Design a protein with these regions (language model features):
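Active-site loop->helix "elbow" adjoining a glycine-rich segment at hydrolase catalytic centers
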Residues: 122, 172-176, 204-207
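A short, hydrophobic beta-strand element of the alpha/beta-hydrolase
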Residues: 200, 227-229
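Alpha/beta-hydrolase fold nucleophile elbow
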Residues: 115, 191-203
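Non-catalytic accessory segments of hydrolases
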Residues: 1-171, 440-455, 461-470, 488, ...
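Mobile gating loops/cap/lid regions near enzyme active sites that modulate substrate access
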Residues: 74, 79-80, 385-507
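Alpha/beta-hydrolase active-site loop
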Residues: 168-189, 247-248
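Short glycine-enriched nucleophile-adjacent loop
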Residues: 207-219
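Substrate-access "cap/lid" subdomains that shape
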Residues: 186, 220, 229-345, 374-397
């Protein structure tokens, strides 16, 4: 039987894609199992090389003839870590400069106006890509009748290095994401999508990027709703901090006060090697983040939310996993055998003279935890939970409806030591628990389909303009949180972290 590939007629030119059938068991009886049309590796901007390195993206030009869109484009230049290899079923890639592409999943390239969901991947602003197997959008498109888009954007030194003689540097990766959203506005109707119903969603650095977008005036109107998984508005960098990072990179390159033109002439591999040397020298786990004070991101996102000067979506869904930091602390040999005094010593960096009281509080909340797990719980709140609470408060004050969740299902990996760690919810959101790589992260757990379908459906409902669950109220002074789990603790919980918040000087 001769099956012709799907074709999309976009304003930039024609695209030839592939047809993909969904797979996996049906947990809740709503799976359509209809095939979807997939278009991969679509350029949304020119390759950021030469004078475009560190500069804002330049939109991709139109083309003539039929363009093949059957292969993912290369990732942004990077040195993948352990998690990225697991996410993609073990594949290792270092990427290429010509990386500014996106991918589209749709049930049909017709005249329907389906909701659109644009995924921004995580990876500490250093790694990742839109073609990772966990991010396959087939289930969203087939079951939820949404058009699913994943994107690549510049990472690390290429996306977030601040240079004094390049005024738009420091936010190039964020500008890439916004340019991809402009592409969606101009082209998504050709894939059966509605440019007026765009939901942007992401995890970790992807969610943190969305948090930054909430402070970008030029992003207003590019998306209507936002979903922020394990990231809020706290991960931005001042210009002074950014200058220090630039100096560290220049030291690693053996340069003093390098200009943008000098750095544009250095091979990408050499810049990556210098970046890796920076990481080995210690310091921040997020050495590159969007930089404040430029034309794209003039003020802190929380201030922009309060002032009404940023993107201002109509609604936000956001949350965390229960044990975020265990993804990192479970492998930390320095925590093996740590005692209470050791945790207090670490806590002084954040809490000063009150460190002992804070550690005592967390120990009383988690009496069965070992001291390493107590420390991990404190860091989970510091890095993820408290910023999520701050975001919820800012949105409530600004009159933007928001819903908060916690994902509490623990992976059995490493004998259960990782718990419900950072990133573990991703295959559940995409309903891809059977994708290659997911089993490495989820361990030998069985019967995950129902929880996966529930979480996927909540995201689909939200993209269609509804509350994520009929019994899940928007945030108010009672701080409702929806707990995702496959046991009897699942469902609505009111203000589950009131005691923890007390030691972070929040009400």
């Amino acid at each position: 039987m001769d099956v012709r590939p799907p074709v999309a007629h976009t304003p930039l030119g024609d695209l030839s894609g592939v047809t993909q059938a969904p797979g996996g068991p049906d947990a809740l009886g709503y799976r359509s199992n209809r095939p979807v049309e997939v278009f991969r590796g679509i350029p949304y901007a020119l390759a950021p090389v030469g004078p475009l390195r560190f500069a804002p993206p330049a939109p991709a030009p139109p083309w003539s003839g039929m363009r093949m869109a059957d292969q993912f484009g290369p990732m942004a230049p990077q040195i993948p870590g352990l998690l990225e290899s697991m996410l993609d079923g073990g594949r290792v890639a270092v990427g290429e400069d010509n990386c500014l592409t996106l991918n589209v999943w749709t049930s049909a390239c017709d005249q329907e106006k389906r909701p659109v969901m644009v995924w921004i991947h995580g990876g500490a602003f250093l790694t990742g890509g839109g073609g990772v197997s966990w991010y396959d959008g087939t289930r969203f498109a087939s079951d939820g009748d949404v058009v699913l888009v994943t994107i690549n954007y510049r990472l690390g030194v290429f996306g977030f290095l601040h240079l004094e003689d390049a005024p738009d540097s420091g936010t190039a990766g964020l500008a890439d994401q916004i340019e991809a959203l402009r592409w969606v506005q101009n082209n998504i109707a050709a894939f059966g999508g509605d440019p007026n119903r765009v939901t942007v969603f992401g995890e970790s650095a992807g969610a943190m990027s969305i948090g930054s977008m909430l402070g970008v005036p030029s992003a207003r109107g590019l998306f209507r709703r936002a979903v922020m998984q394990s990231g809020a508005c706290a991960n931005v960098m001042s210009r002074e901090q950014a200058k220090q990072r630039t100096a560290q990179l220049c030291d690693a390159l053996g340069l003093a006060n390098a200009t943008a033109d000098q750095l544009r002439n250095i091979p990408a591999a050499d810049l990556l090697a210098a970046q890796q040397q920076m990481l080995r020298s210690g310091g921040s786990a997020l050495p590159f983040q969007p930089v404040l004070g430029g034309s794209l991101l003039p003020v802190h996102p929380l201030k922009a939310i309060n002032d009404g000067t940023g993107a201002r979506p109509e609604a936000v869904l956001h949350g965390t996993t229960l044990d975020e930091m265990r993804l990192f602390t479970a492998w930390d040999t320095s925590l093996a055998g740590i005692d209470g005094d050791g945790v207090v010593s670490r806590a002084r960096a954040r809490h000063g003279d009150t460190a002992h009281d804070v550690v005592d509080l967390y120990r009383s909340i988690h009496p069965t935890f070992d001291w390493g797990q107590v420390w991990s719980s404190m860091e989970t709140d510091a890095v993820f939970r408290i910023p999520a609470h701050d975001l919820g408060d800012a949105l409530m004050t600004a009159g933007v409806p928001s819903w908060q969740y916690v994902f509490a299902w623990p992976t059995p990996l490493l004998g259960g030591r990782m718990g419900a760690c950072h990133a573990v919810e991703i295959p559940f959101v995409f309903n891809n628990v059977h994708q290659p790589g997911a089993s490495q992260f989820l361990g030998a757990a069985q019967h995950l389909e129902e929880l996966s379908a529930q979480m996927n459906w909540a995201w689909i409902r939200f993209a269609h303009g509804d509350a994520p669950h009929p019994q899940w109220p928007a945030e108010d002074e009672t701080h409702p949180v929806w707990r995702f789990h496959n046991d009897d603790t699942a469902g609505l919980v009111l203000d589950p972290y009131v005691r923890e918040r007390s030691c972070w000087h929040h009400s």
